[in-house]
Every structure is written in structure tokens, then in C-alpha cells.
Amino acid sequence: MRVKFHTTGETIMTQDELKKAVGWAALQYVQPGTIVGVGTGSTAAHFIDALGTMKGQIEGAVSSSDASTEKLKSLGIHVFDLNEVDSLGIYVDGADEINGHMQMIKGGGAALTREKIIASVAEKFICIADASKQVDILGKFPLPVEVIPMARSAVARQLVKLGGRPEYRQGVVTDNGNVILDVHGMEILDPIAMENAINAIPGVVTVGLFANRGADVALIGTPDGVKTIVK
């Protein structure tokens, strides 16, 4: 694993400014003439703003949520359906937590299923996040699980058996028409095993653990500048 810094000088940056810095830093991975996989959330929104400056140089994007699709279109970037695309060079998205093995918790914005699908197609996953998202052990951030509505209670009982405290995210319906259970109290020592166990529960669409397919590059916004970590 390689780490390098791009310093931003002595200026004290807010959390949003750190997110903006990594969003724009991700442009270095965008190749002209390609279709770019784009994530969801406040940090990904900064990347979309940056991508708008290259709209004449790329073919377009594949989006992980309706919200990102609307933002991309508002900037004049063509949005492809994933079914129209054979492969993606990169997928750029944020994270709610990321550990030292480049495994992540994602899904705070309820777009985890589409995010996971697009990440699986991309050759390279670029994670963009501010330093507050770096953790030693995943699980302090509630783990999102997308669930078929009729299975909500049954899935919740199984999540309790795995050591969690599931909480129904009231009023949230995913772009796929499903619901979210946020699982509190997890100390995820083996993220791959936990991802596989939760995904095996009938009624689960997917869990917001990105352990089997983690990030290849992490751009981390810190007070000292953008830190690049390459797996």
C-alpha cells in the first residue's frame, strides 16, 4: 500500500472544503473519451461539480442514484443506463467509514445497492472522503442494509442474532422501492465474513459493507492536504 500527500498550504479547511478538495482531486483519474461511474452523497456531489468542467471530454457517466443523475444532467453530462455499458474504467464515490484495508461502510444516502453494482463493474474504485471517515474497525457508523419491505421484521431478527441493533430508517424508500435497516452496535472485525453473512439472509437486497470489493485508491482530505492511498 502506497501513501502520498498533496499539500494545500497553511489554510484551515472546513469539512465541506475537505470534501471539495478530494472531489476535485479525483479528476486526475478521469480519462478523456470514457464513461465515468459516479456515486452518491455530499462528497460525490463535489466530484460531479468537478466532472462538469470535463463534460466536453468524456462520453458521459453512469449514476448510482436518481439524485446524482439529476445533478449530472443539470451540468450537461449524458447519463448512460448501466445496461448500455460493457465496462467502466473508474467509479468515484464517498464512504461513511473506510479502514486500513480499503474496506468501507457505505449507504448513509440509501443508494448502497446501485453503488455496489456499479463498483463491481468498474476496473478501479476511487474512494473520496475526509479524514473523519478513516477508522481502525468498521461499525461505529450504523451499517445500512437494504431490505425488501415485507421481510423487514424477519431480517431484523436475524441481524440481532449477528450482534447488531437494527433500526428501521423511517420515511426512507430507496430508488429501488425498498427500505433501510440501520444496524447499530456492530464491531466488524471480519468485514468479508459479515458482508457474506448478511447478504445470505433472505429478504436482504444488499448490505452497505464494501469488503469483498473495496477501494483501489482512497483520496483522503486532511488538514495537511489530500492524502492518496493506493492499495
From Swiss-Prot:
<comment type="similarity">
    <text>Belongs to the ribose 5-phosphate isomerase family.</text>
</comment>
<keyword id="KW-0413">Isomerase</keyword>
<dbReference type="GO" id="GO:0006014">
    <property type="term" value="P:D-ribose metabolic process"/>
</dbReference>
<dbReference type="GO" id="GO:0009052">
    <property type="term" value="P:pentose-phosphate shunt, non-oxidative branch"/>
</dbReference>
<protein>
    <recommendedName>
        <fullName>Ribose-5-phosphate isomerase A</fullName>
        <ecNumber>5.3.1.6</ecNumber>
    </recommendedName>
</protein>
<dbReference type="InterPro" id="IPR037171">
    <property type="entry name" value="NagB/RpiA_transferase-like"/>
</dbReference>
<dbReference type="GO" id="GO:0004751">
    <property type="term" value="F:ribose-5-phosphate isomerase activity"/>
</dbReference>
<dbReference type="Pfam" id="PF06026">
    <property type="entry name" value="Rib_5-P_isom_A"/>
</dbReference>
<dbReference type="InterPro" id="IPR004788">
    <property type="entry name" value="Ribose5P_isomerase_type_A"/>
</dbReference>
<feature type="binding site">
    <location>
        <begin position="40"/>
        <end position="43"/>
    </location>
    <ligand>
        <name>substrate</name>
    </ligand>
</feature>
<comment type="pathway">
    <text>Carbohydrate degradation; pentose phosphate pathway; D-ribose 5-phosphate from D-ribulose 5-phosphate (non-oxidative stage): step 1/1.</text>
</comment>
<feature type="binding site">
    <location>
        <begin position="93"/>
        <end position="96"/>
    </location>
    <ligand>
        <name>substrate</name>
    </ligand>
</feature>
<comment type="subunit">
    <text>Homodimer.</text>
</comment>
<feature type="active site" description="Proton acceptor">
    <location>
        <position position="115"/>
    </location>
</feature>
<feature type="binding site">
    <location>
        <position position="133"/>
    </location>
    <ligand>
        <name>substrate</name>
    </ligand>
</feature>
<feature type="binding site">
    <location>
        <begin position="106"/>
        <end position="109"/>
    </location>
    <ligand>
        <name>substrate</name>
    </ligand>
</feature>
<dbReference type="InterPro" id="IPR020672">
    <property type="entry name" value="Ribose5P_isomerase_typA_subgr"/>
</dbReference>
<comment type="function">
    <text>Catalyzes the reversible conversion of ribose-5-phosphate to ribulose 5-phosphate.</text>
</comment>
<dbReference type="GO" id="GO:0005829">
    <property type="term" value="C:cytosol"/>
</dbReference>
